[in-house]
Amino acid sequence: EMLMDDDSLSENQLGELMKTHQTLEYITKLNKSLLLLTKIDNGQFTDTKDLELNTLLKQYLEDYKEVYDYRNIEVNITEQDRFHIVMNESLAVALLTNLLKNAFVHNMDGGRIQIIITKNSITFRNSGSGHPLDEEHIFERFYQGSKKEGSTGLGLAIADSICRLQ
């Protein structure tokens, strides 16, 4: 990043530096996702506690508010009940943030996200981006229904792995 501030760089050199920086960010994100999946597969998240996912979801939804507002995406939460679960808090956060990101990334500008919380489930629905996901493959690692820049194709695989632990 400091190199990009160098005024002596040509436009071409700056462009190459920016590409390299984006590639490094992608590789870092991919590495973190694969490490998380490996830890989940190896059962390394043993510390659990009673969590109320309604509050946790709203807390992380607030973090995404500006991003959703930027694309004019309306988010509605219907709370039919409180969702209590005993699980690892880090995994709960990873699950919810992956689902929130996915609902945003695979949505259209001016779209909607509907989140329905019951005693035993949380359902995410969005208006979509015009490209339906293949139901047989959406939880496969590296599957991407439509290639999104910076996407690793691991978000729903992580969410699926976390849910299978419960």
Stretches with model-predicted labels:
Residues 20-27:
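Short alpha-helical segment of the dimerization/phosphotransfer core of two-component systems
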Residues 42-47, 84-88:
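Conserved micro-motifs of the catalytic ATP-binding
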Residues 49, 74-84:
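Conserved catalytic submotifs in the C-terminal HATPase_c
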Residues 52-64:
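Short beta-to-alpha transition helix within the HATPase_c
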Residues 103-104:
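Short helix-loop "hinge" at the ATP-lid/N-box region of the Bergerat-fold HATPase_c
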Residues 110-121:
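Short beta-strand/loop element within the Bergerat-fold HATPase_c
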Residues 131-142:
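Short conserved segment of the HATPase_c
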Residues 163-164:
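Detector for a conserved hydrophobic position within an alpha-helical segment of the HATPase_c
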